[in-house]
Every structure is written in C-alpha cells, then in structure tokens.
C-alpha cells in the first residue's frame, strides 16, 4: 500500500516486465486491453489507477490488492500474466465518489482513467481495436472539488514549501497555499523555526515538497506530523522558471500587475499551480491572484497551544466541544469556513480588528436587520465551490442553479443592507461585493433551467421547455415516437390475442416485445413468427423484436441523442457566461461569508451576553467578569451558572511590562479553566468577536503560548514530563513581552524538589527575561514567597470552603495564596475506598508534622507499610440519634408541603441535633 500513500517517494507499481520465453514455456499473450492498461499505469507511477470499463472502474495487480483491503471489496482475478493470475476488483462508476473519499481518507492518491470514445467507434477501426482511454484527473487530498469529498465547513488546502539555503540566519522558506474549491491563493515567507506554528495555523490537507527537502533529516520531524506529504522532482521547485510558469497559468505577460512576490514566494506559488495543472490534467481551475500575507500580521500559535486550547478540535479529535463549535452560529458553509480561518489566525493590527468589531456591533444594535439577513443567507448556496466545479468540467445543472440563486440572494441582501444608517466600513465593502454580479445572468439562468434538476448533466432534462425552439422540436419528435410505441403495443396485443403483451426497454436489448412463457410458442409459430423475431428466453418470459420496432427505436435513439446534445450545448453556453464573470461571483460569495460571520457573532454576543472588547496597541490585559465560552455553554445546557472571574495582567504603576499571576488552589477548583478562559478571551477579541466578560481591555497579543495538560509521546520515546519540558522550553525561548503565556503545574511528574526548582527558575525567567503577561498555576505553595522579591508577580488563589471534613469548590479567583491543595478531599470525591482515604490522612498528618528535610527512611519507619485501619475505624457505627434523624428526613415529602410546613419541619429536625 505504501506506493500509493503520501510521505512516500513515487515509485511505479511492481508489475513484472514481460521477458523472452521459449515457445514451450511462453505464457499467455497479454490482451490488447491489458497492454493498454500497463502502458497507462507505467505513465502514472505512485498512483492507484481507476480504469474505466463500461459501468465499472476496474483495478488490477497491486492496485486491486490494496483497494480490496482498503475498501472491503471482493478480490477476484482476470487472465494471467507471466503464468500468474492477475488480481482484479472493481467499483461501480455511479458509486465511485464514495470509494474515492474512502481512499483519499487513507492517504491513497488515485488516477481516474476514462473511456475517450464510444465502443462502436473502436469496433469501426477493426476487430482488435481497443477503446481509447486516458487519465482525465488525479485525485489527491489537496486537489478536491466535489461536494461529497469535501468538508463544507472547512477549507481544503494544498500547500507547497520552497527553501532557500541560509547562512547564519538559517534557512528561509517560501510557503504558498491554495484551495481550488474556493480559488483562495496565499503566499508568505517564514524562518524554519516558525514553520511548525505556520503549518498548524493553515492546517493543509496535502503538502508538496521537493524530493531533496523531503529527504532532509532536519525536516523529517515537521513532515511526519502532516496529514499527507507528496515529494516532487526538483524542476517543480525551479526558482528560475517560477515567474514564467505563474504568468502562463494566469495568462499575463508579466507579474507586475498580478502580485509582487519574493523569489521564494514565487517558487512556492509556481510549484502549487504546476501540481494543480498536473492533477487536473490540463484543466486550469481559476485562482485568485496570490495574496501576500505580511509577516507578523497574525497571532502566532504553536501546535501544542492549539491542541491544549481545543480551538477547532477537542483533544479527542471532535469538532463538538471545541471553541469553534461553541461560537459557530453561521448559517452558510462559506461563513463557517471563514470563521474557522479567522479563529486559526487572529489579527495583530488594532485597526483591522476594530473594523470587524464595528460590523458585529452594527448587527448587535439592529436585531431586525440581523435576523432578516440571516434568513436571506440561509437560502444562499455555496457559489465558490459551484464555480470551482464548473471551471474544471465537473459541474452540473445544480451548480448553475446555485449561481442563479446566489445572485438573487445577493440582490435581496443588498436591498436590506441599503436601509442601514451609515453602515460601517466592512459592511460597506460587503455591499460593494454583493452589487458586482449582473442580475441579467440570474434572469437568463431562470429562463433556461427547469424546476427539477438532475445531478449529472448527461442525464438531460434540465433545460426548461420553451427556452430553445430547436430543442423543443427535437423533444417533440422523441416523445411522439414514444407514443407510437405505446400504440404499437396495443396493436400487437390485438394481432396476437395476447392481452398481457408488453413493449419494454433496457440498455442491452433496447426496445423489445415481452410475453409470458406460456405465450412464447404462439409468437414463434406461423404465421406470427414472420413478424416477431425471437431474441431471448428467460425463466418466466420470452422476448421478441420486430423490424418495425427496430426502426422506431432508431428514431427514438437519434431524437433522444440529438436532444441531449442540444442540452449539453446550452449547458456549456450558460457555463461560459458564468465563468466570464467569475471574479464578480466569487466577490459576492466572499461578501456572503463576511456577512454571515458578522451576523453570527452578533447573535452569539446577544444570546450569551458577550461585550465588545477594547483592543489597542498597549500591553494591557484587564478582564472583568470573564467566562470560559465552552464551559459556560456546557453548564447552561445543564441549568447551572458559570462563576465569572476577573484578571488583570496590565503593567502596574512604575513598570512597563505586564504582570505574572501565580495561581494556587486545590485540584478541581477551576485553575485550568481560569487560565484557558483568559487565553480564549484574548483570542476571540483579536478575531474581531465580542467576548464573554462584563468588560475587557486587551493589548495586542502577538504570540499565544499554552502549557496546560500533557500526555506521553511514546512514538518518539518521550514521557509526559519530557513533553512538558519541551513545551516549556519553547515558551521560555520564544516568548516576548507582547506574548500571553499560560502555564499549568510546571514541574510535575518528577521528584518534588526537582519540580519545585524547575518551576521556581521558570518563573524567574518569565519575570526577568521574557517579561510577558503570564498566568502560572501551581501546587508548589512555596513559590508564593517569590512575590516578595519579584515586583510584577501577583499571588492569586481559587477560593474553597471546608464543610464537615469535605471541600466545597466556590470557583472564585481572589488575591492571596493557598496553603494546601485538598488532594485527599478530591480523591474522596473521586471515589477512592474509605480505607485508602483514612490511611492517606494519617500519612499526610505525619508528613506535615515532620521537617521537610527529615530523612525519608525515618519517615517510613514512623509510617509502617500497610498500616490500614480496620473497617470499623474507617466507618464508625452510626449513633441512635443519627439514625433517627435520617429516618425523619426520609419521611418528609417536600413536593407535598407548603412553605410553612417545610419551615416547621426544618425546626423540628434542628431541635433533634445534639447540643455539641
């Protein structure tokens, strides 16, 4: 299977080459069809070949063996090659997209080979002629256009990496990524150290690299984490020919009017378009001119932080439960994709963020406009992906209808937005985009397209009657011939005296006369056998034809074929009209997406009581009444409130840098939630969203780091502690004063004093060297003493309350520090056996009474092993008074009591309590 998968240098399939053999041992000669198959296969190494034969795509040799296992289909055989059976399997053409989806999901790339002529044309050339076939497309993870192969709510990016060897500054990399299903095309440059974070942000479905870079050991750890990597020959990444290839793709004479790119960016961009042309086999999907992404224009977030904060997927890999799932109120797939893009790349320019917030605020203030627009958007189709399919010849009548409906929806949305009083800048730009497509095209499509449309254009019947006179005339001829067949059936029934006689049709026999077996002999006997010609005998039926029926069939077939060809010509003409204004249609589609995101975030703000954040260029960070957006929604579904908390990491008087909060408190109290919620509030603010707080002021965060939770990485031989240290090292080495850092329990997983010393040193480094805004949660209570010597360190704790030996979590963050972690109480809540809890308490008491530096052996001697108290000691007998109290409570029926009766019962119970 490896030869088809990503991350493998492309190699031809291992089909034995025919060798000379003596006549006695010569194997059976290959058929012309199999020779054709091997020629096509050899021309497409490293790809699984879907070889069209009639209504099936057939697979042979290793392809068949791999596909059989990957798809769970039956493996059979067809003929022999060099004395060995040729493995074979197949999939129906009509279900091929489903099978392609399953193969792509497993990293298998497929070449689709179609019949390029009708079998009749091959027969006309001679008995041994083979139907001409050719590969019409190569299906790879990054070059998909079909709806059923794509996630409607996510982009499908193909990304290329070009490298320039560096000197003391290290390698520079050019990146280009495109989505041919939406025409997006973006380029940037980055350093090697920034590559992992950049790839995590873009989240490409397929990455192409040169074979030299692919084999470079320095890149191996990066490439290993990617979903699909395809190595290509170096000529694809030839910088000397990059601009020429780009100009050729976009049909321009010079790059000056297209985009200003560095040589590295142009090299990566040219590699992308070259790969697209190869996979689409000569087709050129329309792409937007390459848009250059400025370095530092978005918040840098490394892969570990994205995973820890569960931005788009939970740690279990599910969308549900992620931040994206919590805030996504969009009603279109394009809007959902744009929201995901923004969440992956928060802005770092306050003015841009402000424009997005203005758009959201406009729809917060005008609920009627917001709801009207959302109703219109629900009827707006995904125009960008419809355009992409039409541009590469894979579109159908429903894609034309999508463009028609999209233009009409744009008109409706524009009319509704026009009544807004002084629309903000972003809404004004949306209005300009919605006005670009000409209404005349929608009117033309409305006249041309029928109400009920087939999925595939070859099915015909999609052009409305009355649109084209020639088509109507041809259809009438076809339909009239069918009426003749109906009258012929009645005449034949009278002629034969067989009332059950039927004229039927199938793709093998065409039109035929069918009678039951008991009447078959009658039609095969004189005089009827002069008219009825026997064709086929089945178990219960006998089938015949007549010369008259053959003539009518030819007329029907000819008329039907002419009608279909006329419809296909009309389809091509309509498609050309749409592609001619493709830029206008794509602009309107993007306008829909922007409008959808703005109205969705406004709805979120009103539904969940979010406020507009103040975002500026300072180092401030002041959140009042902040809440975790995901946890709050989860609690709301359960009917429980979320306890809001404030956080202020802004520079204190006399200091330029932000504060470092040291957060102590027990397990389960909400420390990790508090850390995450502040990071998520900053992130939401910088994508241009309102935030879950009563007030928020955010100074731009340029890098976000999170070290919250860790797991083993056994594949790389890393323990949990090692993973934690690697992530912490990245933070200490990379965080600047504009960064926001959240760290949870640094130093756990090793000896107590080792962990404490690591956490101690990390805090000092963050305070003195990184000087960034930081939230640091810990169970090392000794660290709180650092506040005396580190002026920007602030101690905070999560409040709890003890009640009759149990701990009650209040989830309130207050100034101060905790003196204990309540680990045993949490263990009790988790259900540890009472004997274990009791033993743990006695051990803890002894440890706390001892000097921290006391010899460990002496402590063990004082705490003999297995000194577990008896069950009676752990669970003392219940007193008679307690038993009576329990019985009295059980006898109460609160639902049947008045408030006065309930109060009286409470007083009676209190009177029974012991005086002590």
From Swiss-Prot:
Domain of life: Bacteria
GO cellular component: cytosol
Binding-site residues for ATP, renumbered to this chain: 665-672
Keywords linked to the UniProt accession: ATP-binding, DNA damage, DNA repair, DNA-binding, Nucleotide-binding
Stored InterPro entries: DNA_mismatch_repair_MutS, DNA_mismatch_repair_MutS-lik_N, DNA_mismatch_repair_MutS/MSH, DNA_mismatch_repair_MutS_C, DNA_mismatch_repair_MutS_clamp, DNA_mismatch_repair_MutS_core, DNA_mismatch_repair_MutS_N, DNA_mismatch_repair_MutS_sf
GO molecular function: ATP binding; ATP-dependent DNA damage sensor activity; damaged DNA binding; mismatched DNA binding
GO biological process entries: mismatch repair
Family matches, as Pfam families: MutS_I (PF01624), MutS_II (PF05188), MutS_III (PF05192), MutS_IV (PF05190), MutS_V (PF00488)
Cited Gene3D superfamilies: 1.10.1420.10, 6.10.140.430, DNA repair protein MutS, domain I, MutS, connector domain, P-loop containing nucleotide triphosphate hydrolases
Record has DNA damage as a keyword: yes
Keyword field contains 4Fe-4S: no
Described purpose of this protein according to its UniProt entry: This protein is involved in the repair of mismatches in DNA. It is possible that it carries out the mismatch recognition step. This protein has a weak ATPase activity.
NCBIfam families, per database record: mutS1, PRK05399.1
Similarity-based family: Belongs to the DNA mismatch repair MutS family.
Name of protein: DNA mismatch repair protein MutS
Organism for this UniProt entry: Bradyrhizobium sp. (strain ORS 278)
Source taxonomy: Bacteria, Pseudomonadati, Pseudomonadota, Alphaproteobacteria, Hyphomicrobiales
Gene designation per UniProt: mutS
């Amino acid at each position: 299977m490896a030869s088809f998968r990503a991350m493998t240098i492309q190699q031809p399939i291992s089909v034995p080459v025919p060798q000379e053999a003596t006549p006695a041992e010569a194997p059976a000669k290959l058929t012309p069809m199999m020779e054709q198959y091997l020629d096509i296969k050899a021309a497409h190494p490293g790809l699984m070949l879907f070889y069209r034969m009639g209504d099936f795509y057939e697979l042979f040799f290793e392809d068949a063996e791999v596909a059989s296992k990957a798809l769970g289909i039956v493996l059979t055989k067809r003929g022999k090659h060099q004395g060995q059976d040729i493995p074979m399997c197949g999939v129906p053409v009509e279900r091929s997209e489903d099978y392609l989806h399953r193969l792509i999901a497993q990293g298998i790339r497929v070449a689709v080979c179609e019949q390029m002529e009708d079998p009749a044309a091959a027969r006309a050339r001679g008995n041994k002629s083979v139907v001409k076939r050719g590969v019409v497309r190569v299906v790879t993870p990054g070059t998909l256009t079909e709806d059923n192969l794509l996630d409607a709510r996510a982009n499908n990016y193909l990304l290329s990496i070009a490298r320039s060897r560096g000197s003391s500054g290290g390698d520079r990399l050019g990146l280009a990524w495109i989505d041919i299903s939406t025409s997006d095309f973006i380029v940037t440059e980055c350093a090697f150290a920034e590559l992992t974070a950049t790839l995590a942000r873009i989240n490409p479905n397929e990455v192409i690299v040169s074979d030299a870079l692919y084999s470079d050991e320095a890149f191996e750890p990066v490439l290993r984490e990617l979903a699909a990597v395809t190595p290509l020959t170096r000529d694809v990444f030839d910088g000397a020919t990059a601009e020429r290839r780009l100009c050729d793709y976009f049909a321009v004479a010079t790059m000056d009017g297209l985009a200003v790119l560095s040589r590295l960016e142009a090299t990566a961009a040219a590699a992308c378009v070259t790969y697209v042309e190869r996979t689409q086999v000569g087709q050129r999907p329309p792409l937007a001119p390459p848009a250059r992404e400025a370095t530092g224009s978005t918040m840098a977030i490394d892969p570990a932080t994205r995973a820890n904060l569960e931005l788009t997927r939970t740690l279990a890999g599910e969308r549900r439960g992620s931040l994206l799932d919590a805030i996504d109120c969009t009603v279109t797939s394009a809007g959902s994709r744009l929201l995901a893009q923004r969440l992956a790349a928060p802005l770092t320019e306050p003015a841009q963020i402000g424009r997005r917030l203005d758009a959201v605020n406009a729809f917060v203030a005008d609920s009627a406009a917001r709801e009207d627009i959302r109703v219109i958007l629900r009827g707006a189709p995904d125009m960008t992906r419809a355009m992409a399919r039409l541009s590469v010849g894979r579109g159908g009548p429903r894609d034309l209808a999508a463009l028609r409906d999209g233009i009409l929806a744009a008109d409706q949305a524009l009319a509704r937005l026009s009544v807004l009083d002084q629309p903000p800048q972003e809404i004004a730009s949306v209005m300009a985009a919605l006005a670009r497509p000409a209404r005349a095209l929608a009117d033309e499509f409305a006249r041309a397209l029928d109400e009920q449309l087939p999925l595939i254009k070859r099915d015909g019947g999609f052009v409305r009657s009355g649109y084209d006179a020639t088509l109507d005339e041809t259809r009438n001829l076809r339909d009239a011939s069918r009426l003749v067949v109906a009258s012929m059936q009645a005449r034949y029934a009278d002629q034969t005296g067989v009332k059950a006689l039927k004229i039927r049709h199938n793709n093998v026999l065409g039109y035929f006369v069918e009678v039951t077996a008991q009447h078959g002999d009658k039609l095969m006997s004189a005089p009827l056998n002069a008219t009825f010609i026997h064709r086929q005998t089945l178990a219960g039926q006998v089938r015949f034809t007549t010369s008259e029926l053959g003539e009518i069939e030819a007329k029907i077939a000819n008329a039907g074929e002419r009608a279909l060809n006329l419809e296909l010509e009309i389809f091509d003409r309509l498609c050309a009209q749409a592609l001619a204004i493709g830029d206008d249609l794509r602009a309107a589609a993007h306008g829909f997406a922007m409008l959808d995101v703005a109205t969705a975030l406004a709805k979120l703000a009103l539904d969940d009581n979010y406020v507009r954040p103040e975002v500026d260029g300072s180092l401030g960070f002041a959140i009042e009444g902040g809440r975790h957006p995901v946890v709050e929604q989860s609690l709301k579904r359960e009917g429980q409130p979320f306890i809001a908390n404030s956080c202020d990491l802004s520079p204190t008087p006399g200091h330029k840098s932000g504060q470092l909060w040291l957060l102590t408190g027990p397990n389960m109290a909400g420390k990790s939630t508090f850390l995450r919620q502040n990071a998520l509030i900053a992130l939401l603010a910088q994508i241009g969203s309102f935030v879950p707080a009563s007030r928020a002021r955010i100074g731009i965060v340029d890098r976000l780091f999170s070290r919250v939770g860790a797991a083993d990485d056994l594949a790389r031989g890393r323990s949990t502690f090692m993973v934690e240290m690697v992530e912490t090292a990245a933070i200490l080495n990379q965080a600047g004063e504009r960064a926001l850092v959240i760290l949870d329990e640094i130093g756990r997983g090793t000896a107590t004093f080792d962990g404490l010393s690591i956490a101690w040193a990390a805090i000092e480094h963050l305070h003195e060297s990184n000087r960034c805004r930081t939230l640091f949660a810990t169970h090392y209570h000794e660290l709180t003493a650092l506040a005396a010597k580190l002026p920007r360190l602030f101690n905070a704790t999560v409040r709890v309350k003890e009640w009759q030996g149990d701990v009650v979590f209040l989830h309130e963050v207050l100034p101060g520090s905790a003196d204990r972690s309540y680990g045993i109480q949490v263990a009790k809540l988790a259900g540890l056996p009472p004997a274990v809890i009791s033993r743990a308490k006695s051990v803890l008491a002894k440890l706390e009474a001892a000097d921290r530096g006391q010899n460990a052996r002496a402590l063990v001697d004082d705490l003999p092993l297995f000194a577990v108290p008896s069950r009676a000691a752990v669970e003392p007998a219940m007193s008679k008074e307690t038993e009576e109290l329990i019985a009295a409570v059980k006898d109460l029926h609160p639902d049947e009591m008045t408030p006065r009766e309930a109060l009286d019962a409470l007083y009676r119970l209190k009177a029974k309590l012991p005086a002590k």
